[in-house]
Amino acid sequence: MHKQSHVWSIMALLGFMLLGPVASYCGQPVTGDVWAEKNPLVIKIGTTVPLQSPYWIGVRAMAPLIEDMTKGRYKFEYYPSSQLGGERDLAEGVKLGTMKLTVVSTGPLSAFNPMIKLVDLPYLFTSTQQAYKILDGSVGRQILDEFDKSGLHALAWYENGFRQLTNSKRPVKSPADLKGLKIRVMESPVMVDSLNAMGAQAVAMAWPEVFTSLQQGIIDGQENPAIIHLMNRTTEVTPYVSITNHFYNPAVVLVNLAWWKSLTDFDRQVFQRAAETSRDYMRWFIDHYSEDALKVAETQYKNKIERNVDIAAFQKSVQPVYDKYLKQIRATQP
């Protein structure tokens, strides 16, 4: 625990250095408000995943940056492992203003931003670098800006990584192997249709229900990035892992729009830059440790890692999903 606290301190220091231009906003040094330092605004951050997961790698790099740069006018409280609800609940809470900030996967967010369906399309990206180039550019920003229409504001894309299939029944190398398997997916119409097209029986389910449902045999498997598979202990109940890379699935840092507009220009810049700095660290972490997570799943939990997957067959199986959702998305554009 002591060692981990040093990690966050180092990240905060690095972020502080990167945030140099913000500190001199309008040529004015940051001045502390004694009352604000003694009575900071407490921001609760909830996620569905445990503290060791990539989301919290990002959040616990972002929060100290904001606290430091605002001289303690904001403080953060952490609520991991679905303590504040599922991902849709978290997004709804931020929209309603009962929470100020959260990090949510794209899967449940199409109800708040139809454009997010684009990002959820299967096999859309072939590499993380390709994904970063698109999402960090004008197209990605345009998609994020659509959240403003529903009372949310998106600061940045966070990282999940590529998702893999895991199940309790058998090795999966091709769509034919998925036939009859009940696979949990996020509450995303695109993801439901994609897994069904691949041959599975997709079951949309909020994350708090998943582990028990796997234990009881209500579902046969799930799909998640390797690190999430390890951190959420699905390694214990779904030992067959297929490296399908079927979704590149980012997350979004969301804040309440009305609250965001009430902030000073300086504070908005601090939050924005802190979100982007922590995003970059998350990406580095996942890029460096995803393979390690698979090795732990294989050696410690005796998971069987299937790398010889017929990706071309999976890509072909989901073509109808593209036809359906590209038509829907085009229909929403002026």
What is each stretch, according to the model?
Residues 134-136:
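Short, Φ-rich (hydrophobic/aromatic) sequence segments
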Residues 26-130, 139, 147-334:
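N-terminal secretory/targeting leader peptides
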Residues 143:
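Basic phosphate/pyrophosphate-binding loop/patch that engages nucleotide-derived ligands
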Residues 1-42:
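Short, low-complexity disordered leader/linker segments with a strong preference
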